[in-house]
Structures are given as structure tokens and as C-alpha cells.
Amino acid sequence: MVLCLRYQTDELNLYRMKRIAILGSTGSIGRSTLSIVESYPERFAVISMAAGGNLETALADAKLWKPKVISVAKAEDAGKLKAQLQSAGLDAIQVEYGPQGNVAVATHPDVDFVVSAIVGVAGLEATYEAVKAGKSVGLANKECLVAAGELITAEARRQNKPLLPIDSEHNAVHQCMRGGRIEEVERVWLTASGGPFLHTPKSQFASITVKQALNHPTWKMGKRITIDSATLMNKGFEVIEACRLFHMPPEKIKVIVHPQSTIHSLVEFVDGSILAQLSVTDMRLPILYALTWPERIASELRFPVQELKRLDFHPPDMEKFPCLRLAYEAAEAGGAKSIALNAADEVAVAAFLEGSIAFLDIPRVIEQTLRETKDHHPESISKVLSEDSQARHTAVEIVDHLAKTKVISPSAALTR
């Protein structure tokens, strides 16, 4: 079986301008994508954008990029944006809102490539509809593959269209596997920085503050993903993503702690050879790779090889970071368990950030939610979303119980 890295491509269309949609245009991935478009104006054109709740940035982007469609979160904001665009003489721009607005952005007939970067399951329906509409998709949204990876990858195979990972680790795996066959792969190694608590004794975890948990040693990211990195749940999600993207069982996806974050992933082959991908820690590089695949084009991003002094690796401590263990269990079960893992984590992290529960309660909420989730496989996106809603309800009840029965130390809340 050939890896899902080869697709029929139109040689004549390979080098023409790529017309893109950005789901999550005001977030960090969206801004990095627009930076690339700005650097390569002869290569890319922005056709549509989903801006979420950031009305000010949406207006500025609409004026600058002049997309055919722009979507915002709420109907009220859509009305305001439409009026502002009319005043600016840009009334030709179609303004949409809500989940269906995201779908309109992702499925616009002029779009070739969709960058899926809306955080959470809010981007799930639009991403699936983009795949269903025959678009090539660059995935920066972990939740899509964690919650509905089986459905999305199956549809991509039906459409014979690529799902190109933007997540740096999976992008690295994709590059290492390029041109290979799945039978040749012994295992995949996903590297983890270890987060801010790599060397913190487990005995001190009870007093971890939000401020400490948000202090990631390598990456500057959003709050949820930064907390997920602190618990290693982010790496657990990546295990599930890798299983779905590369059609491999969980036992072939390994996590290795690599504090320098120099190597993004490694692929070990059956003959004992190991390929590793090294690059600067700049998300523009994996985005550029996804946007230009199967080509590679020149960029100014360079890794200073001469400054490389050491590479450290050691196995993760599953007892210290139980979220990683829970993710492997969910990866093995798939279906509703994976959905519940993501939903419960989002609820638990939000509660921790608010100071309602302690850092150690995050895996407790997730594990209890998984216990209360029946093992089955939703067969449609609507059923996935329904399962997600139920899991969130369960997780909220568990959080409420913990908040009522435990006294959260002031040190566990963000210092105000």
C-alpha cells in the first residue's frame, strides 16, 4: 500500500497561482499564512477568510486582501462588517457568519486549498465539507483529526485529495515519509519538548499555577495548547492525529522527549534507517510546505546547523503525565473515546485557566469522562458533534463536582 502522500496531480496546474481559503484568519496560523501570501504574491491569492469574533482585524483584512467571501462568528458582527465594507466601497465582498459562514468560506468554488486553523470542533464541519467538496486541505486543527479523523481521512481518500499536516511534528513526518511505502515504516517518533514541568517533581504538581503552566520553554502559542503542552496532552492528540493521517496503529507511534525541539519528528524504517526533520521553530515553514506541496520553493528561513551543540532524548514519564497515557487509550479505541478525550480536555483546561480546578484535576476530569463514555463509532459529522456535546456536558458536571468538593489553592489560579 502506498502512503497517502501521493495523489494524482495536474502537471499543468502545479505552478499556477494557488487560490486559498483560511479558516481562522485572525489566529496565529492565519496570520502566518497571510505573511506567506504577502511574501509570494505571484504564488497565492486569498479567496475567502473566516475571521471569528475579531471584527476589527476582519475589517482590516477585508480591505487589504479583498476576498470574495469573509465570515465572522455572529450575525450582529456580520451586519456591522457589511455596513463598514459598503462605506469603504467594498460591497462586492460577501459577508457570512456562524458555522455555515465557515462552510461557505471553505467550499467556495474558486478555492483550491483550504488552511484549517479554527481552534476546537468549531472548525470540524467546515473542514469536512471542504474535503467533501474536493479541496486540498492543510490541517492545523488538531481537533478535526482527534474527533473525526476516521471520517475525514476516509472522505479524502474518496476524493483523492491530500490532507497536508501543518502541525510541525506531522509535517516533519510527512516530509520524512515522502515517496515511501507504509510497509517500509517500522515506527514514527514524535518529539516533545517536555513542557515547562519536565524537571518539576510530581510532588510539586499540586501547587502549579496558571502562570507557570503558560510559560512554555520553546513555543509561543494560545492558552489551551500551551496548557496541553504542559500536561503532554498536546502530544497525546498528536499520537491520534498521526494514527489517522498515516493509517498506523498507536503502537507504531512513539513519543520521545527532546528538550531542544530541534528535531520535529523522526521516521524509523524496517531496515533500521531513521530519517529526522530539523528546521527553525517557525510555523511559516510547515505552512509553506503544505501550501506548495508537492513542490518545494525557496524561503529565507534557515536552521543554523553550525550552532547545533547537543541533542537529548529520553522517554516520557506516563505516571507523571497521565494525559499521554489516556490519549494512547483513546487512540486505540477511536470513535467516541477520542471525541470525549478532546471535549473533556477542553472543558478541564478552561476550568483550570479560570481557577475552578487545580492542575492535577485536568487528567482526573478527562479520565472520568472517558469512563462514562460508551465505546462506539459515530458515522457522521452530526453524530460526532452530538457525541462531543454529550462529553462536554459530562465533563462540566465532573468539574462542578470537583469545584464544590475541593478547595482550590489561590496559587492554582492566575496571579491577578
Regions found by a protein language model. Give the residues of each.
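Low-complexity, intrinsically disordered or signal/transmembrane-proximal segments
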Residues: 7-8, 15
